[in-house]
Amino acid sequence: MALITRKSFILVGVPPIMKSLIPIVLATLVILGMGCIGGGEEKMSLKVSSVFGNNEFIPAKYTCEGVDINPPLKIEGLSDNVKSLVIIVDDPDAPMGTFTHWIAWNIPPVTEIPEGIPKQGEVDKPIHIIQGRNDFGRIGYNGPCPPRGHGVHHYHFKVYALDTTLNLKPGASRKELEKAMEGHVIQYGELVGLYERK
């Protein structure tokens, strides 16, 4: 019977061959554990950029204080086996918890998302895109609009590269989108923009 003491972790009564396998088993468990916990960190291979830099302020044009259209996004590093893109834009600093500003899917693996995508369920021009309902209760993009005096909010423009297209109807919720995406994300990248209303 093997005995493991808390202080020394000395194994008593374990054959030498078994002892030699212990480091390998432990290393395997650590790697598997990192895979479960880390999730998509190893997939964060896309570079996402726009007219503002990472952790820089978003121009008012793309907010509720401006024209309120989506900013252009440039995507670099897409693999050849990507079948479609998903975009999720959210604000984790919202008073009631993470607030979703835009969800879109079945975007072809293009390197640029133009600004001003029409706010309707399915769009064919300037690119094909299907859009869902944001937390304003509207379809399409609605930009930053934090409460006045609430400080600087961080807006995460997340791009997911999938190995498939999704069988999801226009107007779907973020929860439905995320469920449909499960097991299909092969690359990921994000851009963080800032905004504040004083």
UniProtKB/Swiss-Prot annotation:
This is UPF0098 protein PH1269. It comes from Pyrococcus horikoshii (strain ATCC 700860 / DSM 12428 / JCM 9974 / NBRC 100139 / OT-3). InterPro entries: PEBP, PEBP-like_sf, YbhB_YbcL/LppC-like. It holds the Pfam family PBP. Gene3D superfamilies: PEBP-like. Signal peptide: none annotated. It comes from the Archaea. Belongs to the UPF0098 family.
